[in-house]
Amino acid sequence: MTDPALIDVLVAKQQIADLTAAYCRGVDRADAALLGSLFHPDSHVESGPFNGSGQDFAREICAIVRTVFTQTSHANAHQWVEVDGDSAKGETYVTALATPRGQEGDPVHMLTGGRYLDRFVRTNGTWQFIERRFVCDW
C-alpha cells in the first residue's frame, strides 16, 4: 500500500512546480491577471528594487516587460521544496533572458541567473506564493 501522506507531498510538490512554471509564463507573457492569481492576498515579494505585495508586483513587472523589453524568457532549473501540511518552503534556480527595446543592429541580450526563495500556502486546495524573494547570483 502507498502511504497517503507521501502521495499528498508528491502531489503538492508537482502543484508547486506548476505554480513556479506559471509564474515564468505570467512574467514572460506580461499577463498580470495570471501572475496576480498566483499570489496569496497577503503575499510579499522582494525582487530587485521592488519590495511589496504580490498583486502590486504582478502589475508593475508586467508593465515593465511590456514597455522596456521586446521579450523575456524565464527558465526554471532545479527546485527544492519542503512541504509541511498546507505550507511549504522552497528554492528554485532560474535563468532569465531579456532583450531591451530600442536597439539598433544586433540586439544585446541580458542574461541573469539566480534563485527564488519562496514560501507557499495552500488554501482551498490551491497553492499560492505567500512570500517570494529573488536572489541574483550572476
State the predicted function of each range.
Residues 102-110:
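Short, surface-exposed loop/helix-turn segments at secondary-structure junctions
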Residues 89-91, 113-138:
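Short beta-strand edge/turn micro-motifs at domain boundaries
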